[in-house]
Amino acid sequence: MPGVVFDLDGTLVHSAPDIHAAVNKALAEEGGAPFTLAEITGFIGNGVPVLIQRVLAARGEAPDAHRQAELQGRFMAHYEADPATLTSVYPGAEAAIRHLRAEGWRIGLCTNKPVGASRQILSLFGLLELFDAIIGGDSLPQRKPDPAPLRATAAALNEEVVLYVGDSEVDAATAEAAGLRFALFTEGYRHAPVHELPHHGLFSHHDELPDLLRRLLA
């Protein structure tokens, strides 16, 4: 059987609430005003450095490498200390992956979240064992939408990877750049209408995913 690679945030787990909490904890330490969940959700997708850049820009702060590193470090300390209290696995996601594994699929994860935090979250939800390869936002010099992380994940699976499953503009662009078909989860963190994202199939509930993959392989 071929391989399939998944994104994490907004695709397999609804993690925005914990990311939101960690950002606001870091800002509260310096007396900063909190962001709303919707605001932080809108900043997710390009990795932690870009998340923090967007937070600082939204506060009206000029780009500053020292400031970026300082806030990013405090954010990660809070996030890694409590990454999953408010996070949930999307309904049907675990069952879908277990179903695919039972059919012989090799399963990979390609995310812009740091690999340590990604493994921690997967472990807390009992999902870590389901993945044959994991590439995070700090595994390579490049991050999505550069195709290098997705290609590295595919290579690590030692199978022909035929599909990337994600939820956002970043994921769609990554799959396109890597030359892979893309399955779009419509209930994640995308900003644009579905029709504006290049995709080969879409689904709104993970129960639909195994049948969708079979159709895309036909």
UniProtKB/Swiss-Prot annotation:
The active site is at residue 7. Coiled coil: none annotated. Keywords: Calvin cycle, Carbohydrate metabolism, Hydrolase, Magnesium, Metal-binding, Photosynthesis. One of its GO terms (cellular component) is cytosol. CDD domains: HAD_PGPase. It comes from the Bacteria. HAMAP family: GPH_hydrolase_bact. PANTHER family: PHOSPHOGLYCOLATE PHOSPHATASE (PTHR43434:SF1). Specifically catalyzes the dephosphorylation of 2-phosphoglycolate. Is involved in the dissimilation of the intracellular 2-phosphoglycolate formed during the DNA repair of 3'-phosphoglycolate ends, a major class of DNA lesions induced by oxidative stress. This is Phosphoglycolate phosphatase. The lineage of its organism: Bacteria, Pseudomonadati, Pseudomonadota, Alphaproteobacteria, Rhodobacterales.
